[in-house]
Amino acid sequence: MGGVCPKIKSIFRRNGDDFMIIVIDNYDSFTYNLVHYIGEFEQDIKVIRNDEMSVPEIMDNNPSKIVISPGPCTPKEAGISVELIKTAEVPILGVCLGHQAIGAAFGGNIIKAPEVFHGKTSSIDHDGSLLFSEIEKSYDVVRYHSLIIDMKTLPSELNVTATLSDDKEIIMAVEHINRPIYGVQFHPESIDTNNGTKLIENFIKKI
């Protein structure tokens, strides 16, 4: 959950091949931090606001992968994010609000977190999912959110791949059981998140 950045514009840079990443911007100030991290590994990026195009119009762009950004709202208010998760047949990474949208897309409840986190550093433990390849099993991440996916209503289609180190009931990452859909509650694009660049690299190069 970040602040609103109302004048973000779409960018589209071709690099001579057919690989292209679409970033769904949920009107968040962190979106272009995320784009910057993605740009370290793939320069062909298109940023589309969550109410700028329909899902069919987005898919007509033939994205290779989709990243759904953080945002200051709930999944229900995140434009086409939830519908896109349900229907797109390409790898998806959801960050913060994007992660919550994954939970909502498959029927999970999105509930208030035990406390509001704004720039808080927490330790997480992960299970070795491909998204966390070559990353130590416990490490520190930065969190900006007031909502979480409810562990008690976690959809059967999703596996938990990371939790807080000190509270295993707080979901920090999920993965779909048979589709390349991944969500992280924390902000890999924050400078104070360890291994954030590596996580983005894993999504782009290994998934």
Which ranges hold each PLM region?
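Catalytic beta-strand/loop cores that center a nucleophilic Ser/Cys/Thr
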Residues: 130-178
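A short beta-strand-loop structural module common to alpha/beta enzyme folds
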Residues: 44-52
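Short, Lys/Arg-enriched N-terminal segments with co-localized hydrophobic residues
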Residues: 7-19
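Acyltransferase
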Residues: 190-207
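Short amphipathic alpha-helix with an adjacent loop that forms part of the alpha/beta core around
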Residues: 54-62
